Amino acid sequence: MKIGILSRNSKLYSTSRLVEAARERGHEPRVVDVLKCYMNITTNAPTVRYRSSGVSEELQFDAVIPRIGASVTTYGCAVLRQFEVSGVYSINESIAITRSRDKLRAHQLLARKGVGQPVTSYAHSADATNDLIESVNGAPLIVKVMASTHGNGVVLAETDKAAETLINAFRGLKADFLVQEFIKEAGGSDIRCFVIGDKVVAAMQRTAQPGEFRSNLHRGGSAQVVKLRPNERRLAVQAAQVMGLDLAGVDIIRSSHGPLVLEVNSSPGLKGIESATNKDIAGAIIDYIVKDVLNGPNKPKGKG
């Protein structure tokens, strides 16, 4: 099977592991930089072409694995959509990726389906600042920039006054942001659930460094294998399905009123989860694709 891996850097751990796992199983993987792709949008004959080293060629794959960075979401999803209309299978569809990348939209979709998550508020008017703070039960609270990744642009406000100052500062920078309740009892830990299809294939607990509330591994957090409770497994799978994702990293947090979803990641990294659990996650992804391709082209999943 010819498998295209849409990634801007073939040396990244996740990308190289997918290449390795595909080759081990006798497939033909190829890493493709989406920014070097261009589309021929012709009625009844849509194609994706690739220009590298001065040579242009039509790309033909049986399946693609999107590893599209947040900074190139719009163009990357346009390329992926072109593969989709050409009948190429993708483990995650472009519409599902765009749902999950829009933090506000994702929270709205999860809320509509009854998926537990921290109380979240959003407003445009400066007149609503106090209402935002009150709606999440006051400080301490989290202010999260919509475009944040790896914990960047996520700030803890310890007091209502600090929250007001922070919100006004973000407004002054024309930043789009959410205000979210702070789950103190989580103690700076969250759980990354790695979902493939309708199963959680691995999970790790991430713990923040002392004095830090963000548990992201990119910010120096530590990771260890964790045993999930049945309701946590169900929640993670449900969250991925609401987004329409067959491959997802679902971040959940343990609160006094049950597990809550923090975020659904459509392009979860493999290094942390494979290191913590000692599982061949890359191989599980390839195995799932091979099995799912037999079911035919993608059918849109999720709504909204």
Curated annotation (Swiss-Prot):
Binding annotation for ATP: K144, E181, F182, D190, R214, S215, N216
Residues that coordinate or bind Mg(2+) 1: D251, E263
GO BP: protein modification process; SOS response; translation
Disulfide bonding pattern of the chain: none
Binding site for Mn(2+) 2: E263, N265
Residues at which Mg(2+) 2 binds: E263, N265
Alphabetical UniProt keywords: ATP-binding, Ligase, Magnesium, Manganese, Metal-binding, Nucleotide-binding, Protein biosynthesis
UniProt keyword Nucleotide-binding, yes or no: yes
Name of protein: Probable alpha-L-glutamate ligase 2
Gene for this chain: rimK2
